[in-house]
């Protein structure tokens, strides 16, 4: 902003982590109502405290990794709040694309006897696929009547994943699965910005983009050299510049 490469804007950073690792910006009585927190509380509080332009056309929702997943999901479900959305290496954008990863991670796995055992023994940096599976279960297939973890895991009894009620709950919050029923919301966005690294292969970004093309929904897609966490500062700056040019009419 000091170099006048960006227009004036207020950036609100949201912490979406939980004891399980990530909330995936879902509403859950066990880990918190992150969906409503982002779309209702944060918007209302920001407009009440700061010099905002309190209207849809001046709001963007963006995120990196899990945040990119959440941003795309929430702008579809809450179409009247945001006009721009940005997803930097949104993870995952297609739950089906990662199904085999989650299934393999959970196969033969002994379920921890407590949340402390889970968080102490299953760490993202050591076994991200298993840790991510538990985080998603806490967000998407919570079960308040099933202590001590209060969640259900998919791929347990059904040989047909598409008939597995737990897996179906995961798909209900899957950005790719939501496109067909929320195409009007996406089509009404002023801007959709997506990026991912050329070395990233498990996000489902390409599947999501094909779905946008299928419904003739406009978007901007940038592929950078590197992997998930590379060039984060540059990527955020590039996305913000993209939004800024739109808000200022190209100035």
Please tell me what each predicted stretch does.
Residues 1-251:
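Non-catalytic cap/lid and distal C-terminal segments of serine-dependent acyl enzymes
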């Amino acid at each position: 902003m000091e170099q006048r490469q960006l227009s004036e804007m207020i950036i609100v950073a949201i912490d979406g982590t939980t004891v399980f690792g990530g909330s995936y910006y879902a509403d859950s009585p066990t880990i918190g109502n992150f969906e409503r927190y982002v779309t209702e509380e944060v918007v209302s509080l920001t407009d009440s405290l700061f010099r905002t332009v309190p209207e849809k056309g001046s709001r963007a929702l963006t995120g990196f990794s899990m945040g990119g997943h959440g941003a795309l999901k929430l702008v579809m479900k809450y179409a009247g709040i945001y006009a721009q959305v940005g997803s930097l290496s949104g993870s995952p954008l297609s739950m089906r694309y990662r199904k085999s990863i989650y299934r393999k991670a959970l196969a033969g796995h002994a379920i921890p006897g407590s949340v402390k055992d889970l968080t102490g023994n299953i760490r993202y940096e050591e076994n991200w696929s298993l840790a991510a599976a538990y985080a998603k279960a806490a967000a998407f297939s919570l079960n308040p009547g099933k202590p001590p973890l209060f969640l259900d895991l998919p791929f347990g009894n059904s040989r047909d994943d598409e008939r597995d009620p737990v897996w179906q709950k995961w798909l209900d919050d899957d950005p790719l699965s939501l496109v067909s029923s929320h195409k009007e919301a996406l089509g009404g966005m002023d801007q959709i910005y997506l990026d991912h690294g050329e070395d990233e292969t498990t996000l489902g970004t390409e599947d999501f983009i094909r779905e946008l093309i299928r419904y003739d929904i406009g978007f901007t897609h940038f592929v950078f050299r590197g992997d998930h966490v590379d060039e984060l500062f540059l990527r955020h700056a590039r996305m913000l510049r993209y939004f800024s040019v739109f808000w200022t009419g190209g100035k």
